[in-house]
């Protein structure tokens, strides 16, 4: 295989943002296994994970096309293939659309209408609402984007149940809330990039003081909402213990941002890093510490 072909293939992989796909795989598996309550259909599980991964990859590829102008202004993203021209925008867009078609087809064939609906809503919000408009024009872009980031575990959950019940609602709220301090931490340690691209994330638009306050508040509310899973009977004492330990540590870490001698860049990286540990730990624990509970539907669609 020639070096040129290898580089091109690497470029196609990079536009799908493998790190984001991996994180979503963990969360969709967590939601799926929580809902399965020990009765795991492996074919359905892997079809859901692969299908949703392709949908996420599609959204990321299309996002690369949309963001190429602002990516050119940011140190972290200026070498993306859609910026350098190593791969044409048309090729990346076609690649992304193709991934999306295959991903949605897999979800439609193997899962159910509700799982497909949530995947579609998440896709439209991320690509159509967040990437095309909110990210560039509003300080609330992060809030809107948090919904699409919370969709994967809900898709995994609904792929099993075929209904929207309280467990799915808690997952949606929990993962949406987690996205906020996670994203604000990135915006702080990448402050110069966002400012250069004129992206109105909270630290840039309204200052570090407000950003630090929001990080603390969102972590606190995230902890409370996460505790609803065991309190509602969906998980057991192990999940409650992990929720308490990780959330308390994350909150204590966030509060250190108010120290006068703190290096904000280093602090934000720590908050970001521990956010990954927190959500991974909770996703794994919910998959293992599920409880058998009656799943009362709030919304059901015909499969």
Swiss-Prot record:
Q: What does this protein do?
A: Converts heme B (protoheme IX) to heme O by substitution of the vinyl group on carbon 2 of heme B porphyrin ring with a hydroxyethyl farnesyl side group.
Q: What is the lineage of its organism?
A: Bacteria, Pseudomonadati, Pseudomonadota, Gammaproteobacteria, Alteromonadales
> What are the GO MF terms of this UniProt record?
protoheme IX farnesyltransferase activity
Q: Which reaction does it catalyse?
A: heme b + (2E,6E)-farnesyl diphosphate + H2O = Fe(II)-heme o + diphosphate
Membrane-spanning residues: 18-38, 42-62, 91-111, 114-134, 139-159, 169-189, 213-233, 235-255, 274-294
Q: What is this protein called?
A: Protoheme IX farnesyltransferase 1
What's the chief localization of this chain? membrane
Please tell me what else the database record remarks about this protein: Carbon 2 of the heme B porphyrin ring is defined according to the Fischer nomenclature.
Spell out the PROSITE patterns in the cross-references.
UBIA (PS00943)
**What is this enzyme's EC?**
2.5.1.141
Q: Where in the cell is it found?
A: Cell inner membrane
Pathway in which this enzyme or protein is active: Porphyrin-containing compound metabolism; heme O biosynthesis; heme O from protoheme: step 1/1
| Database matches in InterPro entries | Protohaem_IX_farnesylTrfase, UbiA_prenyltransferase, UbiA_prenylTrfase_CS, UbiA_sf
Q: Name one GO cellular component term.
A: plasma membrane
- Record key words, sorted: Cell inner membrane, Cell membrane, Heme biosynthesis, Membrane, Transferase, Transmembrane, Transmembrane helix
List the membrane topology term(s): Multi-pass membrane protein
Q: Which CDD domains match?
A: PT_UbiA_Cox10
Please give the biological process terms from Gene Ontology that the record holds: heme O biosynthetic process
Q: To which protein family does this belong? A: Belongs to the UbiA prenyltransferase family. Protoheme IX farnesyltransferase subfamily.
Top-level taxon: Bacteria
């Amino acid at each position: 295989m020639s070096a040129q072909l290898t580089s091109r293939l690497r470029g196609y992989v990079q536009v799908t943002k493998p790190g984001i796909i991996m994180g979503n795989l963990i969360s969709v598996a967590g939601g799926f296994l929580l809902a399965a309550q020990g009765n795991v259909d492996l074919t359905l599980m892997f079809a859901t994970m692969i299908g949703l991964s392709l949908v996420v990859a599609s959204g990321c590829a299309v996002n690369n096309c949309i963001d190429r102008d602002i990516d050119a202004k940011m140190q972290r993203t200026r070498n993306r293939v859609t910026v350098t021209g190593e791969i044409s925008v048309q090729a990346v867009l076609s690649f992304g659309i193709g991934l999306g078609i295959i991903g949605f087809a897999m979800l439609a064939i193997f899962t159910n209408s509700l799982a497909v609906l949530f995947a579609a809503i998440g896709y439209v919000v991320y690509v159509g609402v967040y990437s095309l408009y909110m990210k560039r024009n509003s300080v609330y872009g992060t809030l809107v984007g948090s919904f699409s980031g919370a969709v994967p575990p809900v898709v995994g959950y609904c792929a099993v149940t075929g209904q929207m019940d309280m467990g799915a609602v808690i997952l949606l709220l929990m993962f949406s809330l987690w996205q906020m301090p996670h994203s604000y931490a990135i915006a702080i340690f990448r402050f110069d990039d966002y400012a250069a691209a004129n992206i109105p994330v909270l630290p840039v638009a309204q200052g570090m003081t407000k950003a630090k306050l929001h990080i603390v508040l969102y972590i606190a509310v995230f902890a409370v909402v996460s505790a609803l899973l065991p309190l509602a009977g969906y998980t057991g004492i192990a999940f409650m213990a992990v929720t308490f330990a990780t959330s308390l540590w994350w909150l204590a870490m966030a509060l250190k941002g108010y120290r006068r001698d703190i290096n904000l860049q280093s602090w934000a990286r720590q908050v970001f890093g521990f956010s990954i540990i927190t959500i991974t730990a909770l996703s794994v624990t919910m998959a293992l510490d599920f409880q058998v509970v009656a799943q009362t539907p709030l919304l059901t669609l015909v499969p």
